[in-house]
Amino acid sequence: MATVNTDATDKDISTFKVTFTLVVSGIECITGILGSGFITAIYGAEWARGKTLPTGDHIMLMLSFSRLLLQIWMMLENIFSLLFRIVYNQNTVYILFKVITVFLNHSNLWFAAWLKVFYCLRIANFNHPLFFLMKRKIIVLMPWLLRLSVLVSLSFSFPLSRHVFNVYVNSSIPISSSNSTEKKYFSETNMVNLVFFYNMGIFVPLIMFILAATLLILSLKRHTLHMGSNATGSRDPSMKAHIGAIKATSYFLILYIFNAIALFLSMSNIFDTYSSWNILCKIIMAAYPAGHSVQLILGNPGLRRAWKRFQHQVPLYLKGQTL
């Protein structure tokens, strides 16, 4: 059985590392919570009023709500793993954090992939029968695909609760330079089971996202070149919008892949628990949903207008509270 074993003591993490990790990841998580919470509130309010959400808005609601839960959970895990290490390294608590983290991450990756597939089918233009068929059927199939994604995410995250992670704390490790003892935190990870269940849960949405993003970039690039050849000029608003969409899609594609890699490295315990590399993985994992939530608000005209109204109303509300 291929396992990865790591151990750490309280001395292995400095006050600076704890503070740095909590501050940076905390800012990212709070940004993501505000962004995802705002999107959830906007579309959730429409859904609560009995309105039928368009397919794109429905995906956005599912994605933003799952991201809201993910960022809250990630913030809790960072606090427990850095400040309450004895509690966090109890086997049941540790496994609970890992399984829910994987489930929420897998759900997010699926929803993000479906959002990109939907926009690709709506915006891109390719003369292929399969592409036209998917274009016609996607609106009908999407609600079922979203439900299936949650089920698949659960199916490949719940098995991680058994025979994958094992952690324990030894509180009586002698210190050679003195007569005292120290706590040592041990972790074992079954890499065979982790790689299987993690890859099975992430492989399909990852390929879907890369393929949809690539097709969308190619279609937008081709259309941009066509507009340029017609001498519309780089100052044309439509061309600027296309170039902006290409940049945004490329940026999110890179962030999506980095997040998937960081999640796997963090889950596998390849790096020491409190090493700089593991801290970097935590920061990347928090940056991905926060960055994309901000991009969704800035890139969506309706959300952008709602955000401006919200920014205008908050000072008025606070001013009214002080009177």
UniProtKB/Swiss-Prot annotation:
It is a multi-pass membrane protein. It comes from the Eukaryota. Residues 36-58, 122-140, 212-247, 298-323 are cytoplasmic. Coiled coil: none annotated. It is found in: Membrane. The keyword RNA-binding does not apply. The chain crosses the membrane at residues 15-35, 59-79, 101-121, 141-162, 191-211, 248-268, 277-297. Residues 1-14, 80-100, 163-190, 269-276 are extracellular. Disulfide bonds: none annotated. GO terms for molecular function: bitter taste receptor activity; G protein-coupled receptor activity. Gustducin-coupled receptor implicated in the perception of bitter compounds in the oral cavity and the gastrointestinal tract. Signals through PLCB2 and the calcium-regulated cation channel TRPM5. Several bitter taste receptors are expressed in a single taste receptor cell. This is Taste receptor type 2 member 40. It comes from Pongo pygmaeus (Bornean orangutan). The lineage of its organism: Eukaryota, Metazoa, Chordata, Craniata, Vertebrata.
